Curated annotation (Swiss-Prot):
Phosphorolytic 3'-5' exoribonuclease that plays an important role in tRNA 3'-end maturation. Removes nucleotide residues following the 3'-CCA terminus of tRNAs; can also add nucleotides to the ends of RNA molecules by using nucleoside diphosphates as substrates, but this may not be physiologically important. Probably plays a role in initiation of 16S rRNA degradation (leading to ribosome degradation) during starvation. This is Ribonuclease PH. It comes from the Bacteria. It comes from Cyanothece sp. (strain PCC 7425 / ATCC 29141). CDD domains: RNase_PH_bact.
């Protein structure tokens, strides 16, 4: 009979996604992103200057931080203070890499964009939701710079989105919830541009290997999700 999704979705169906722009007052871009029961607050701040290794080159930079609120999961987690977990460091590097691929830093000038992705509620897919929502916040921050006359042209060169795909009973399923994530034998996070160029693949098997054919199926399903996510980004940004 195969895997039956707890929420009744089809195998290629995303969870409902929404972007609430202007969520906080002071960030240049601020978006509360909801993907099913997962909620991530994505803020982008603009700072003058760049890291030392870029000084004098006329180029900009983007960096990202990722955290989870203690009550974002059913069991309260301790706040990460001075020492970040390996998972947190991995995720914030992923967010930064993914969003840097969206930008032409020569057009940004010597300023740094700081992305803060804070998970308010987690039901799997927090890193993919953070990337997809932070792109919308990034677009709003760039628009603010353009409106203020600080930039002459937009440095955004690619739309970027991310989605999870998992194998459950040997079949690929898009955008896993937590209940599905823990049951999946293979779990992938896929980051792509609007033209479906791959920016990152993170895939692991839990106890079972998977074939090249199944990998191709996973990527096919991911492309379906990326197209829909970027369409949602464009819709909310009025593109």
């Amino acid at each position: 009979m195969g895997w039956q999704r707890p929420d009744g979705r089809q195998s290629h169906q995303l969870r409902p996604i929404s972007f609430e722009r202007g969520f906080t007052r002071f960030a240049a871009g601020s978006v509360l992103t909801r993907c099913g029961q997962t909620q991530v607050l994505c803020n982008v701040t603009v700072r003058p200057g760049v890291p030392k290794f870029l000084e004098g080159r006329g180029q900009g930079w983007l960096t990202a931080e990722y955290r989870m609120l203690p009550a974002a999961t059913p069991q309260r987690q301790e706040r990460e203070m001075l020492k970040l977990s390996g998972r947190t460091q991995e995720i914030q590097r992923l967010i930064g890499r993914s969003l840097r691929a969206a930008l032409d830093f020569d057009l940004l000038g010597e300023r740094t964009l700081v992305v803060d992705a804070d998970v308010l509620q987690a039901d799997a897919g927090t890193r993919t939701t953070a990337i997809t929502g932070s792109f919308v916040a990034l677009a709003d921050a760039i628009d603010q710079l353009l409106q203020a006359g600080e930039l002459q042209r937009s440095p955004i060169r690619n739309y970027v989105a991310a989605v999870s795909v998992g194998l459950l009973e040997g079949e690929p399923f898009l955008d896993l919830s937590y209940q599905e994530d823990v049951a999946a034998s293979v779990d992938f996070n896929v980051v792509m541009t609007e033209s479906l160029q791959i920016l990152e693949l993170q895939g692991t098997a839990e106890g079972e290997s998977f074939s090249r054919t199944q990998l191709n199926q996973i990527l096919d399903v991911a492309e379906v999700g990326i197209r829909e996510l970027i369409a949602a980004q464009k819709s909310v940004l009025g593109q």
